[in-house]
Amino acid sequence: MIKALVFDFVQTLGDAASGYKDGEKNAQNKLIEAMGITDTETFMTHFREIRKKHFLAADFDRKNQWKELQALYGKDLGEAFLDKLADEYWQFVIDAMKLFPEAEEVIIDLKKKYKLGLICNSQRDGSTRALQSPEFERACKYFDSYILSGTDGIPAKPDPAPFKMMLKNLGVTEDEVIYVGDDYRVDIEGAHGAGIKCVWLKHYSVKRNWPENTLGVPEITDLKQLAELDLLK
């Protein structure tokens, strides 16, 4: 019997896709200008490759990506420049963050029947600032437990530790909880590795090259579809 649901926040309950896109574009343009790049096509190839490498290593600190990029070109723009660029990046994200249209209604309905938990990743970088949005506070009030993984000695998702910690916080077992997230590697593979049933949200409003669902977990494109899943019946 399911007694609890646990969610990721960014791109699961809160949508800041346009902010991430605008923040990336702003960073790319300013790096190109500051580094005196003329071959922008090759630069963008390097930019994407470095970003992918860091994300796969669960390093979401944009400054680390930019430092590697500038080193590749033999440049050093200085900490002040990168700090300012990171501030601008995360401000785009904060300004864009809005709960998905159906999110609050779904959370309120679920709260009547289940315990609710949130697990959000941070790498002690600016990514925590994505949670400074009023929309995060608006959602947080409905949850019984909230874990910021990647801080205070708590490993970041997909490590099983934050998932196991949430089970303890909510007083449930692996068989009594469902985890909902959007990132296949971080959320779905992470929860699955912790022995937790999971649901993959591929929200209809988010344009992304989704990976293959190799685990065969249930998929939804709207949070309202949670109530229709056999897992909750």
Identify the function of each model-found stretch.
Residues 2-101, 125:
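N-terminal helical cap/lid subdomain that shapes the substrate entry/recognition surface
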Residues 1-5, 15-18, 104-108, 114-233:
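Asp-based, Mg2+/Mn2+-dependent phosphohydrolase catalytic module
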